[in-house]
Amino acid sequence: MFLMNASPVVALQSKWEAFGPPGSCRFPRCFSEADEGVESASVSARVQMLISTLQRDGAARGTSDERAAQRGHRAEGCHDARPAAKPTVHKEPPALAVCGLVADFDPMGEEETTDFGPLVLDSDSDDSVDRDIEEAIQEYLKAKSGAAQPGAGGAQPGAAQPSRAAGGGSRCKPEPAHGSAPTALCPPKLVPGSGGGPGSQVGSSKDQGSASPVSVSSDDSFEQSIRAEIEQFLNEKRQHETQKCDGSVEKKPDTNENSAKSLLKSHQEPPTKVVHRQGLLGVQKEFAFRKPPRLAKMNVQPRSLRSKVTTTQENEGSTKPATPCRPSEAAQNKGGIKRSASAARRGKRVMSAAQASEASDSSSDDGIEEAIQLYQLQKTRKEADGDLPQRVQLREERAPDPPAHSTSSATKSALPETHRKTPSKKKLVATKTMDPGPGGLDTDHAPKLLKETKAPPPASPASRSEFVERSSCRADTSAELMCAEAILDISKTILPAPVEGSDGSLSASPLFYSPNVPSRSDGDSSSVDSDDSIEQEIRTFLALKAQSGSLLARGESCPQAAQGPLLPPGLNSQTGGHKTPLSKTPDPLLGCKRKRRGGGHVRPSTPKKMQEVVKDGSQDADHSQGRAEPGHERRDLPIQGKASEALGGEGTARGPGDTRMSQGQGKTDEARRLDEKESSEDKSSSLDSDEDLDTAIKDLLRSKRKLKKRCREPRAACRKKVRFSTAQTHFLEQLGGLRRDWKDRGPPVLKSCLSKSKRDSGEGPGKKPPSVFGSTAERMRQEGAASQDAALAFRVRRPASASASEGNPFPRESQGPAPSPGSLSDDSSSVDSNDSIELEIRKFLAEKAKESVSSSEVQAEGPTALGTGGPARPEVLCRKEPAPPPGVCTRSQRARGVPHLAEGLRGTESAGAQGTAGLFSQGGKGLPAAPARGDPVPPRSTSGGVSAKGLSVSRRNVYVHKDQSPRGAEPAAKSAFGQLPSCATAGTEAGGARGTFHMGCGSPSFLTPSPGAERDAGAQADRTPPWSDFAHQSRLPSPWVLRSEGRDAVWRGGVGSERDKGSEGPARGLPSLPLAGFSPLLSTQLFHFGKGVSWGGRQAGLFSPHLGLPLQGPSFSAFREAQAGPSPVFGSPHLLAKKDGGPWPTRKAQAGLSLHDRRSSGSEESILDLRYRRRVNRDDQEQDALGSDASDFSDTSTEDSGGSSVVKV
């Protein structure tokens, strides 16, 4: 109403006036929300762009108007339910002038209307108002067509360029310049619009559009701007394609109906139009930036079609006054209109229909919907009867003709702009086409063109019939689609994306196919009347498409392959061949779009599709998923495999897809793993949340982009690269030095194994679930593996938890995404590869465990032991631990048990570094994600610089804790040092993870020092030989570090961190891995105990008795003895604390101890350095291997490791 009543004038004035004021004043609802200043600035910039665009692209605007007119025409036809109306309107030659004006008006008017359209849709929520607007628009269009036709002919020729120039310079003048016709058309509206010529109108509409959309959603505007940019790029890209396809497009119209011809003509002219449309697109994009997300998307998707339909609708209805701007724009664009005279005719004809349809589109009235539905049904039937063959022929002809123009093959003229826009719009259109359905429904050609453009795969007559029927179905569901679009826009990031996991992601993956999916679901769900047969046809087609898509998808494993293959084999034979490559052509564009859009828009369209699919597509989706799912699911898995897997229900249907996923496993795994990392790390706690799913989908889409590239690479390579790079590299990146050392020591094999296992693990569980389920299953399996294989279980468990998450991951997956495991199991290659990888990993880990045991025994301090500890760390103990801090006890127990097994294997290694490193690794690694951490852990274990490793591990732990914070590991890591309270448990985990798991265990219990002591006793007993000195240091660091770090220093952070750096760092650095890892661990655990002590000083009793007596007794006995000698201050935990802090029990005393201990740690550093100068040198050597100084890592990275949890957590 606002637009109808005052907005046109306001729109014209608002832009030229203060951009802000007019918007706010004139569009109270829409523009008042927007920031006038921002609007004016952006609008001014956009107006400039629009002016230049209009000047350059007058013809394009005419073309755009024609498109809008076409859409409007189609919409009108649909709205009026009179398919003959189009031809009649099209046949109106005088309408050309009017159309030129109208079409010319439309470009800016549409742009304005694009803004207005959203505004109208947003502002005019009353059906009565919408109906009134629609009626007024229709009447106005009729009157305008009659009145503007005479003057339009004269105004267009002479005034077109002047108003164009004037429009470029001052748009108010061109308005009079283009005068007579515009006056005829615009007199009532020129008055409102006269003040602001097209430019001002556009400005106002931009301003308004910007204002209201900006107020509506800056995110949407941003996304739309991204879309606009993407569309621009795609349009530029497709411009050439369109130009190429223009010939074919021109050829195709012959077979097409008049409407098809008009569409084709308007699209044939797009070479010029395309250029102009691109300008318009840029302008509209600008508008879209500010447009309400939904309408912006609508405008963005079929911008030339949908946007202009909506724009025309709203221009006519809401921006009737803005029509004068159109005349001025028409005058400006008349040159372009002359070029697109026929297009202008079509535009005019379509415009009348479009305006009527726009009213229906914008109003979304039940009556309009009914009219549109009726018309669409009639038209669909007629087209299905007669048009479909022609269109099918055209489509088939086009399929061969525009192979370069992938969409044109499926699209009538491949709608050059539609094709250009299709990549962006395909997604959007997939989304929007369902929504544009209302406006573009009666333009079954246009919707079909868009749909076909989107889904060129259905290039077959059946496909076309399906699309036609779907169009009618969409017409039926136009209101639903619009509502769904709005809902999807709102919830696009929530449920729709995940819901569409199978179909949606497939649709997202194959934009071409995705229209099919939505159209399928839409058609099936919406047009139950005629869609039952259509649905069956669609399902049959989709089944064929799914079969061919599955075959091709298996062959290509890329969405592109599935896109082309999705077409029925027979249908695809002609168009499929073209479309497959053609779809590939859009795929890069889509990839660019997805990259630019972050896949967000694909999701939006996909969610809509999924909504539709979920709505009624459930039948068709289930049916066609059953059939087409092979093709769909594969893509779905790569695209949203994780989300789909998260959608357990779809996961079942994805069984076939997962089977294919083995082929696309590289992609799917990568996507899953990436999503698993991101989502499991960031949102593993809220895997069930739609946002997380959306994020996972985004990640999956990103992964898919990467996978598309990697997809082209060998799948195995992709897996390795993907798995390792995503999961393991993710850790290894943080463990860069460790990873290098690990690599240096030959864990590359393990890496590959781990990569595979991780890859499989990621595949099996479906990333997020794997992180969650895999974590649990891995814990369970790892526990079992720990009992099965000690050192091997450590290593294998890490990889086995990865690889076991491959083999066992199936159980693990079965926990979460059983279908995925099933599909993976179905995927013999994945199962075989998983099993073989798991076996290889286990073998390699067993060998490496032996080597590590030998090397760590040789090294005693256990850089390798740490590495071994790394495997021990991967023990699910840690994972379990994150789940239950008491699990730290279990973890420590398991660390004790398994680590002790490993330690038993490791012997001195365990006693030395393994005890510390192993416990540390277990603690650090286990806590984060035993398997995931385990993977990097081997680098640690292998890598020298244990301190660096330990630090990295601690970081890793911290990081892992963060990653697993959803799991509670992050709190553990943070708690480890940062959150000492939970640190006692989580911190114990982190500390245990970080350092002495024994201590960690004891820490959770410091309470359970006996387990920790037990473990320390056992593991440290093993350590004791190598730890005699370490015992001093580790114990020294642990008691004083723990105590001072204890809750005090560490809790205090600065002192704790410093002291962790100093004491723990030195201890850690000094003992290198064993001590470095163990000291901080002890520090962490003693730290936890220290916390306990610092809490009350009872820790002196608790810590001393437990840690002091048990840990110090068994483990620290040597430590204590050695320490007592080497560091009197560190005589024993009690002695140490008491010596250092005298008042061990008191935190302040501990704080003093922290400082004192730090001093002691400094001296201890000296002492340890002196005592362990050799060890420090070893650490330095190892750390040098890591390329970092032990003390530096100890202080700095210890901050990260010991303090990592403390400081950096």
Curated annotation (Swiss-Prot):
The modification Phosphoserine is found at S1161. It comes from Homo sapiens (Human). Residues 301-321 have a biased composition (Polar residues). This is Protein phosphatase 1 regulatory subunit 26. The lineage of its organism: Eukaryota, Metazoa, Chordata, Craniata, Vertebrata. Pfam families: PPP1R26_N. Residues 63-91, 226-255, 442-454, 609-637, 667-685, 757-766 have a biased composition (Basic and acidic residues). The gene is PPP1R26. It is found in: Nucleus, Nucleolus. GO terms for cellular component: nucleolus.
